[in-house]
Amino acid sequence: MKYASWLTLSVTAFACAGCGGKNTESAVETSGADKTAKTQVLEAGAAVMQNREPLEALNAYIDGFHFYNGNIKGQMEAHHYCALLNEDVTQCVIYDGNTAHSKLMGVEYIVSAKLFAGLPAKEKHMWHSHVQEVRSGQLIAPGIPEFAEKEFMRKFAGTYGKTWHTWHTDQDKELPVGSPMLMMGFTKDGQADEAMIAARDKRFDTSSAENRENRADIDYPAIDPDADAWQKGIVIQLRAIDLKGTEGAETHGAPSP
């Protein structure tokens, strides 16, 4: 799809940013005191006076499902608010709901098949494909017309995502404690919890089954064999270690302790 057409869909999604939302509350209440009147006034002033261009660039809303890498039973709904950086790269912030009190669960970076093909195999092991999410009808773009959603999904089907969750509200955690977790997406029918899908479909007045039928004519690409590595028993997660005195530890360019 040409950039202009994709941009048109993005504008459509932005115009409907308030559509298909406000129907999913956060899974937890946050620990801490209620906002004082002073805090609310300061917050309101900041909202009016400060620049928020990075937030305003989040012009696409996608709702889908993730599971913990290595634990397919640990499944949850994920509300993605995304900015299309260019034709090949999209970045999303992920919430556990779509209301003002939703918790920021994590992030997902999405790249085209062209860019993904150039990544090292070990890097690819941390990424998941999107073919099944689209083909199953379980991935939706709430609030935009059906034709626009289908074109959105046609492009999305060939992409790959790298997702980290940092606040595990599905485990009833009131604070973002614990290690960040690498997440994956479903790759076959029967993997997703049917009750979870049905509950989401009811809230959004959609049907994953009907979505699947509507997307049957999408030309789904072959999946890179190094993606979805959990299917081959390659499971990657972070482990907390004390870097002090640890030789060979990867610090990503951070200053030495």
Regions found by a protein language model. Name each.
Residues 7-8, 82:
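Generic detector of short alpha-helix boundary/capping microenvironments
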Residues 15-18:
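C-terminal motif of bacterial Sec signal peptides marking the signal peptidase cleavage site
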Residues 20-89, 159-257:
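N-terminal domain-onset segments
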Residues 98-182:
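An exposed acidic His-Trp-rich patch
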Residues 1-7:
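Bacterial N-terminal signal peptides that target proteins for export
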Residues 47-48, 52-112, 116-120, 125-132, ...:
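Extracytoplasmic c-type cytochrome modules immediately beyond a signal peptide or single-pass transmembrane anchor
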